[in-house]
A protein has these predicted regions:
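Alpha-helical scaffold domains
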Residues: 1-224
Length: 224
């Protein structure tokens, strides 16, 4: 299936009724077709890995095509330049998160980029840094605790950022790292307690929400 066939397929799956619903969840409705993630996953499975196709999909600027690009790209072929270019194109939280969880967290540059982007000013670039931290904590089964411990100062530093899509990603990263194992759980709770002392409503929300989950019986039972 070449890129023209893929774009035809995407248009055939379009559901304009879904676009309004997506907008209510804070998803940018611009260039959006209203295709569900399960439909995109199914199409990605049919297409297999294709680095060139991924670039063509991304360059289209179509919301779902950009998500699909992250699903079909080959993480072994992704460069630092591509990661920065794609991140600078993020204009919706779901594209950001899907690309981080389907592609970026599988690249050798993931830990480096998470730290870099967490220091950025643009809302979705900054979100990408913390979303990538959360995805690495969720998916990377081999990385040691030291690599995740390096994220805590960045989480603390961004905890007073009032922008909705940043604060939620900071909270997500803190919770996800803290659910990885018992040692990181203690470190995450300690970081949350430090954040709780900050003179910021946003910081207090991030910290209290994380502490509530990380100290819960359900999470504590699963820790090793």
């Amino acid at each position: 299936m070449d890129s023209n066939d893929v774009f035809k397929k995407l248009k055939s799956l379009a559901n304009p009724k879904n676009v309004a619903g997506m907008a209510r969840f804070g998803i940018n409705p611009k260039n959006t077709l209203g295709i569900s993630i399960p439909h995109l996953r199914k199409l990605a499975k049919e297409l297999g890995k294709d680095h060139q196709l991924a670039q063509q999909l991304w360059d289209s600027g179509i919301h779902e095509a950009m998500i699909l690009a992250g699903m079909v790209d080959d993480p072994k072929l992704v460069t630092k330049k591509q990661m920065d270019l794609w991140t600078s194109d993020f204009d919706s939280w779901d594209v950001c998160d899907q690309v981080c969880m389907n592609l970026f967290d599988k690249t050798p540059l993931a830990f480096q980029k998470a730290k870099e982007w967490a220091m950025r000013d643009k809302e979705f670039e900054k979100r990408a840094g913390f979303a990538l931290m959360a995805c690495l904590a969720w998916h990377d089964k081999e990385a040691g605790d030291v690599r995740f411990a390096q994220f805590f100062p960045l989480i603390k530093q961004a905890a007073s950022d009032e922008r909705n899509f940043v604060k939620k990603a900071v909270n997500w990263a803190l919770r996800q790292i803290g659910k990885r194992n018992r040692n990181l759980n203690k470190m995450a709770i300690g970081t949350a307690k430090e954040i709780l002392k900050m003179d910021s409503k946003i910081a207090k929300w991030i910290a209290s929400d994380a502490i509530r989950e990380l100290t819960s019986q359900a999470v504590q039972k699963r820790l090793t």
